[in-house]
Amino acid sequence: MKKHLAFVAVVFSTLVGPVLAHAQLIEKTALTLDGAKKIAAVAEAKAKAEGARVVIAVVDEGGSLLLLERLDDTQVASVNVGIDKARTAAIYRRPSKVFEDQVKNGRVSALALHGAVALQGGVPVIFDGKVIGAIGVSGETPSQDEDIAMAGAAVAATFTK
């Protein structure tokens, strides 16, 4: 019996010990509502300067909506498209244009990726080399949507912890 308990103790410490020695939690930097407002404000200023009628959606790292703006006279359909572009950029940690380019190049399997929208205009928000959220813009041409989104995302370089 003692040998059996000793054996179990050795196996337990060998297999479980290293797992317990590692941290079970990590610290993450999260995008705040204030940060989302700053991102949207820059994007909105660029859109208005260009006379663009767009929806601006800002999501957190997991793709949950933090802020949504629909500029005056923007088509209603752009609301969901803008959110989907932002979510795509957040959960896949790359611009939504990547998926659009894949489809254009014949890789239609990109359309089957869960939660991915193959439309240009979603851009990750990066702070300290990590994706902390994303911005999606919809309502104008694909390249104009992306330019507005990139302007908003760029403000993250000024953020502080």
What residue ranges belong to the model's regions?
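Flexible, solvent-exposed loop/hinge segments and secondary-structure transition points
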Residues: 22-161
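Bacterial N-terminal signal peptides
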Residues: 6-18
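Positively charged n-region of N-terminal signal peptides that target proteins for export
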Residues: 1-4
